[in-house]
Amino acid sequence: MTVQICRAATGPTACYAERELKRYLRKYSGAAFGEGAELTFRLEVDESLPAHCYGWRWEESSLTLRGGSESALLCCVYQLLSQLGVCFSTEGDFLKKPFALGSLPESRDFSPYCRYRGVRQHINFPMDISAYPLGKAKEYIRRLARMGMNAITFHSYNGQWHPYHKGEERVPAGHFFYGQRHAVPADPELAAAVDNRRAFCIPEVEAILEEPDKRERFAVYWLGQVMDTAKEAGMRLTLSVECQESTPLEEEKSMVREVLALYPQIDVLELITPEGGGDNSQPLSSPEAAALCRELFGGGAAEAALQSLRQEGREPWGEVPSTALDAPPPPDTSFFS
């Protein structure tokens, strides 16, 4: 069958959605692409839809895939491919039933129950993507997107993916696994299954493991590239970092500013307490925490964040009211009527 894809949206995620649709149509149906097509796919961003909703509409021999955002449009592409029989997983993809372009599903709309769907990735373990080569880490992110995930959170411990100051000392990024060294065991089966040879880390770093400056630069480059892939795949990107209670406030501010400069891709920066809770003997009061937010991020951004919390029925840094624990209302689908 000859197929044509017409894309109205021009952003990077919409372009990626077109490439993904073409890739899987070619892979599983052997479709040819060009003029005089028997079937046309139209990819559109429809701003009348909520940003996380999507669906498709038939018009004669044309199927229009639309989403309330470019991210939702990409989700629509994967949803359609899933309906056609493609099963996506972190291990790859396969067909769970015969793939037939002649049996495309009828017009349908989708309103996901969760606006943001994704995982929180503490990239600090020898067995996770912390020890993946860059190409494999990028493909892992793409596979998450193909499974319908549109958000991801990366957590960086101090000194791992971002530098920090300890008094007068600057601790560079690239201190993987809290600065501990995890040697690869001399086991043939394990060696065949991992990409490292001497020590667990980003495999490209093994050759420069003893050169802190080069190691730091590549660590930041690696995570930045993985973030770029997540953004192309339409993901809402969060980076979380820990604030140590024993660290002077000025040093924490410096660390936050450097993180923002190193990773401009992020949509949300989370400031969290140290693992295990840390020392809470001198917690910030609500006014102090609000003042810190305004100082770090400016009045407008801080007020928007505080207002968002209030709209969700929560007072910032306060107790969650009992009404917040009630079951959420069903999703609004009135825009489809």
Predicted regions and their residues:
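Short, surface-exposed loop and linker segments with low hydrophobicity and enrichment for Pro/Ser/Thr
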Residues: 1, 33-38, 111-113, 258-261
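A low-complexity, Ser/Thr/Gly/Pro-enriched, surface-exposed linker/loop concept
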Residues: 27-29
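Short, well-ordered secondary-structure micro-motifs within conserved domains or adaptor modules
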Residues: 31-54, 64
